[in-house]
């Protein structure tokens, strides 16, 4: 009886404890859930997305061409050393206060709430086309006339400098043209016997009717206008460095020709860069040594060397493999006293996770245009490469067949092909230098390069290899007889050499024997067919 009573008490106590534990756990779980859903609590990823210099708002369901234009905007802002968040209009209304600079790309008229919210915030706003701009102008009560065009053929013209102006024909759809008193205007659009500015600004409101930034003039002009738009002070923004790059120079390039080009740059007091192709094997061959001797001469006379990314493995997703290739290539040059200060890569490295990991070993990165294989993803929402702190050098902008555009508002590289004759290369160099911009030396900037078992950096024009200062003075190489190690072919060659000696001995002996046989045969034939003469008989007949 006592046992049953004690058991009953114990069971009741156990049940009470279990219920208390359940309610406590439920409260903890509810608190955790409410904390996770609280707007005051955000993840690191959300914080990263919201912290940026520029917010780009785009319309719903962008077309392929619109995605390419958005990519141009993101790349341009990135080259200007700014961070950018890109979101659809539906995700942007509640976060407008977090950004000082806002780009509205092709926003349609059904975004009334967004336009009202934009009109209420005093931000630096740039519109690319879209008929929602009329709602924004109305909400701001600007004295600006808006003319809507469903589809129209226009002539675009833009002056990059007083001496560099370009024009072309374009077709615009679903856009608006503005007329009014503006604080700033640049470029000209001619349409249906009317004219408008390509870019117009009134206070903090900027507008362009063109949304196709794949157009050569638009992509180049935006690089200049974006720098002005982001500049918070009066006047023009500060100048960026411009570079001349002899592009994709292979070790088998004739050293005499390369020396002539280098001397041409030196004699004309030009700052220049040589982009060398990677070498993975046979880096000790005399041809490589002669190539590096010319590079050292260029390096000692103000030229800089950069390494071109491996073409053969550019699409690999294996970071370790790419690092290995780059280490082999770097060592092939540093072994001869040549120090590539930067890496040259396709632009798709900027938007690819593996590419960004590879670039972490370089502070300075030169970019190539790569339209065919874009890695840009609209769902990334942020230019992640910005966080890595690289100095990114954009490729120069090409308009038409041969017209390159360099401007001081963005740092660009003019790539000159060396796969043409010497005089054509010199003409290209002269054409680039005639642009009204200053081309600077890569040695004016500090760089850092890491590899598997080495690193080097430049500081104030001096170079340090594994923390030891290195002399960049040019001294000619001495050349010795080189034994080419060809692996299996080497012992085959030795075997053939030995066999050749044996064959030569056999041929000599055979020739001697053959000669003896000839003499013996002639002697026997003479005895057999030619009769000896008899004495006293002149005719040799009895």
Describe the function of each predicted region.
Residues 218-219, 227-297, 301:
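Active-site beta->alpha N-cap acidic-glycine motif
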């Amino acid at each position: 009886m006592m046992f049953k009573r004690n058991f009953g008490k114990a069971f009741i106590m156990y049940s009470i404890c279990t219920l208390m534990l359940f309610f406590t756990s439920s409260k903890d779980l509810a608190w955790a859930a409410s904390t996770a859903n609280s707007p005051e609590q955000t993840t690191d990823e959300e914080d990263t997305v919201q912290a940026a210099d520029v917010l780009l708002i785009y319309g719903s369901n962008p077309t392929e061409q619109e995605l390419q234009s958005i990519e141009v905007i993101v790349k341009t802002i990135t080259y200007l050393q700014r961070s950018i968040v890109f979101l659809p209009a539906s995700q942007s209304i509640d976060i407008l206060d977090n950004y000082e600079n806002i780009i509205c790309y092709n926003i349609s008229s059904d975004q009334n709430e967004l336009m009202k919210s934009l009109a209420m915030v005093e931000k630096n706003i740039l519109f690319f086309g879209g008929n929602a701009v009329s709602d924004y102008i109305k909400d701001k009560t600007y004295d600006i006339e808006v003319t809507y065009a469903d589809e129209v053929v226009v002539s675009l013209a833009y002056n990059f400098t007083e001496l560099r102006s370009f024009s072309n024909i374009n077709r615009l759809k679903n856009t608006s043209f503005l007329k009014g008193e503006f604080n700033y205007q640049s470029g000209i659009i001619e349409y249906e016997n009317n004219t408008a500015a390509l870019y117009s600004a009134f206070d903090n409101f900027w507008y362009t009717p063109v949304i196709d930034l794949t157009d050569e003039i638009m992509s180049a002009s935006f690089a200049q206008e974006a720098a002005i738009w982001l500049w918070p002070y009066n006047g023009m923004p500060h100048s960026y460095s411009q570079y001349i790059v002899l592009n994709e120079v292979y070790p088998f390039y004739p050293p005499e020709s390369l020396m002539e080009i280098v001397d041409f740059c030196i004699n004309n007091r030009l700052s220049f860069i040589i982009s060398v192709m990677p070498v993975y094997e046979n880096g000790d061959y005399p041809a490589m040594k002669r190539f590096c001797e010319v590079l050292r001469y260029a390096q000692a006379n103000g030229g800089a060397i950069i390494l071109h990314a491996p073409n053969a493995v550019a699409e690999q997703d294996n970071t370790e493999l790419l690092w290995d290739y780059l280490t082999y290539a770097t060592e092939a040059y540093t072994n001869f006293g040549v120090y590539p200060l930067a890496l040259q890569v396709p632009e798709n490295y900027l938007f690819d996770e593996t590419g960004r990991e590879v670039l972490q070993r370089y502070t300075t990165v030169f970019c190539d245009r790569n339209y065919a294989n874009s890695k840009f993803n609209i769902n990334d929402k942020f230019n992640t490469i910005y966080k890595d702190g690289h100095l990114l050098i954009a490729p120069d902008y090409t308009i038409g067949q041969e017209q390159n555009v360099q401007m001081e508002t963005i740092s660009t590289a003019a790539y000159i092909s060396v796969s043409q004759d010497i005089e054509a290369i010199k003409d290209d160099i002269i054409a680039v230098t005639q642009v009204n911009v200053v081309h600077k030396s890569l040695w004016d900037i500090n760089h850092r390069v890491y590899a598997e078992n080495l690193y080097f950096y430049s500081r104030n024009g001096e170079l340090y290899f594994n923390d030891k200062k290195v002399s960049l003075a040019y001294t000619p190489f001495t050349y010795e007889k080189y034994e080419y190690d060809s692996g299996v072919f080497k012992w085959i060659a030795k075997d053939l050499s030995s066999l050749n000696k044996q064959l030569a001995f056999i041929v000599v002996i055979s020739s001697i024997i053959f000669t003896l046989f000839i003499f013996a045969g002639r002697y026997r034939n003479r005895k057999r067919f030619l009769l000896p003469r008899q004495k006293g008989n002149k005719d040799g007949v009895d």
